[in-house]
Every structure is written in C-alpha cells, then in structure tokens.
Amino acid sequence: MYSIKMRASKNGKHISGAERIVNKDEIEDVARELIKRALTHENGTPDFINIKIEEIKEDIEYIDHLPIKTIHCKNKEEAREKAREILRNEGIPDKVIDYAYEIIDKGGMRGAAILNLKGERLEPDKERGVRVKNIDTTKELKEKILKEKLGTERTVDAIAIASKVIHLGVIAELCTSDNKSYTTGYVATKRGYFRITNLKKEGESGGRVFFVKNDVNIEDLIDKLENKPFIIK
C-alpha cells in the first residue's frame, strides 16, 4: 500500500490538503484526482502543489468509524452552545473551551492545536499545529456516508481524522472547516462524531483543537497522529 499526500498553498499560505492510502495500481489515478482537487479549491488557485507518494512499510491498523450523528442548529450561537455541552460532558472546563474557540476564530493554522485540561497548549509549533496523517477510509465507508446521506465528501475526510484521533486517546476534537462556504463543523468524542450545522458563519476561517489529559505523553501522541497508518472502516 502507498500513501499519497497533497498539499497546496499560495504565497506561502495553506489552501488545501488531502491524503489517500491506495494500492500500487491506483497511484496514478488518485494522484490526478488530488491535483484536480487542489486546482479547483474554493479557497483559491494555488501557486504551489506538493504531491508526496511513499510506500507504507508499517502494518496498517483497521478500526471502526465513530457513530455519525447530525445536530441541526439555527445559528452559530446555538451551535457553539451545543458543542460546548458535548465537550462539558467529557469533563472539559468552560475556560478551556473558550480558549479553543479563540484559537479557531484566529484561524490560519495548517494543523491542530492541542490543549490539556489546564488550558495549556502542547503542540511544539504554534503556527503549524499538528497534522493527522497516514489515514484513509474504506471505499465501503465512503459509499455508506454518501448513499445514506450521513454527510458529504468533507465528512468522509473528517471521520477518518476524528476516528483515528479518538482511538489514540484524545478526549475530544472540535473542528470547523477551512472552506469558507462550509459552515457545518463537528465535535468528536468516544460517544460519536457529532456534525453540528452552522458552527461557524459563511466566510469565516476554520480550525481544529484536540483536548487531551494533563498527563498525556505528548511526544508519543504526536508521533502516532502523524505517522501511524490507519484505515477507517
């Protein structure tokens, strides 16, 4: 199996990224698909596209996806309160949730911020954040999500990230999309992947925050988030 990663930017600013895990005979078609995705992204036409293809030599772990649930909210205020309620149920203090919203509102990070329950930021590079890599979903899961209208193409990408993150011991994830027209965000916990409509306003940037225990081994967690291969089924 091979990992194909795409990253696109303009004037040094991140525009889009995606990843697939494929068989050797799928590499050419999937690479072409990811290049097209980069060139047609709503955030703009990139002046730099990087495609990285490498063989996966480590055993790939197959895990079940988190249960998908959708919560419909009328506006951002209602949606944020619903997300807060889910996070509170996992023992995350309000002041830490407030800080997470500040990070997301600021925008501009390629990866995720990591907060412990004291509200301390643990990612080594506060500008870059931590990227969850070496992940994909099975074709069957993608078809199920789209056919049963459990979500969109963006949900397919997000459920892969969320399922891996929670499996590795992260308490919860809070995320809104970089796509300025896509206003549905999510909270992921061991209880499920909660899609929340109107978690941001149209035109706003997005962001991602992982909430972890105070005694987390942060170096080990980041290594697994970035390098351990998972396929979500």
Swiss-Prot record:
UniProt-listed GO biological process terms: biotin biosynthetic process
Protein name listed in UniProt: 6-carboxyhexanoate--CoA ligase
Upper lineage: Archaea, Methanobacteriati, Methanobacteriota, Methanomada group, Methanococci
Sorted UniProt keywords: ATP-binding, Biotin biosynthesis, Ligase, Magnesium, Nucleotide-binding
A molecular-function term among this protein's GO annotations: magnesium ion binding
Family recorded in the similarity comment: Belongs to the BioW family.
InterPro entries: BioW
EC supergroup of this enzyme: ligase
Superkingdom of origin: Archaea
